[in-house]
Amino acid sequence: MKIILIIFTLLVSAGCENTVPEFSGKNAFQYLEKQCSFGPRNPGSLGYKECLTFLLQELVATADTVWTQPFTYDDLHRGGSYDLQNIIARFNPNAEKQILLGAHWDTRPWSDKESDIENQNMPIMGANDGASGVAVLLEITHILKSNPAEIGVTIVFFDGEDLGMSGDNTSYALGSQYFAKNLPIPKPDHAIVLDMVGDKHLHLPIERLSYRHAPRLAREIWKLANRLNLPAFDQSLGYSIFDDHVPLWEFAEIPAIDIIDFDYPHKFDNYWHTQEDTPDKCSPASLEQVGTLLTHHIYGIE
């Protein structure tokens, strides 16, 4: 009798494991390259407009509902005005349990961390800082289309995350600020934001503000990564980073965490906000680790 029970338990466990769809890092990397093929996607640029069209086409093909949330930002530091828009896609919007997955789709108009002064006014390509999180979530949308989840998932591509001036946090994360202050959906149970998740040398400690404001969710996600043997995820605490997760809990009281590798590739040699943030610095394997974690989270929620 014990043998039969053990076999039955193993079969049930195997069946549950098979209900989690496989995430393709290869597909996600193609989405990263596609975004970069438009060039820099800083607001107002040709690349921005072409990428917007591409993202809307992808989401309309997979989601139940898709729309944009337009807003305007007046840059008091540098002057000028920007017409920006968050992109919102919902899957199973009538489900009782709802989560939000987000990433910023804009890229920085300046390479202010460039050592070469002549290049500091050039827009960045943003393969990691811009395209990587969006790439993971685009692959997630195709998984949700083919394998409808029991929970509802809202995917938001935030605009204007990277228009900020150093020292003024309020000039960063503009899209998530506007979204949280003008919440266009019922409040989700929690949110997970992705940023800079494509680094070939991916290292993901627990972002410190995430742990401070959503400790239960942070512990749950990193424990899941540990169970899945995803080596990029480090159980130790990392930096405190003002990112798109902060306005979500600050203005909308949504428990939110940020999955981010800020040392790109490491603290002594960083491609962040330079001309070196290009697809060759990223890898399908890194995207796959993050996407695998999210798929197991989505399909494991009861």
Task: Name these PLM-found stretches.
Residues 88, 98-102, 154-157, 189-195, ...:
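Structural recognition of the beta-strand scaffold that forms the well-ordered cores
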Residues 68-70, 74, 81, 199-302:
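Active-site-adjacent substrate-binding region
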Residues 33, 40-94:
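A non-catalytic alpha/beta surface segment that caps or lines the substrate-entry region
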Residues 27-34, 50, 54-61, 132-139, ...:
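Extracytoplasmic/secreted proteins, especially bacterial periplasmic and envelope-associated proteins
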Residues 121-216, 237-240, 244-245:
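Acidic/histidine-rich catalytic neighborhood of metal-dependent amide-processing enzymes
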Residues 19-22, 37-46, 73-78, 120-130, ...:
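Second-shell loop/turn segments in exported
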Residues 12-15:
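C-terminal motif of bacterial Sec signal peptides marking the signal peptidase cleavage site
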Residues 1-7:
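Sec-dependent signal peptide recognition
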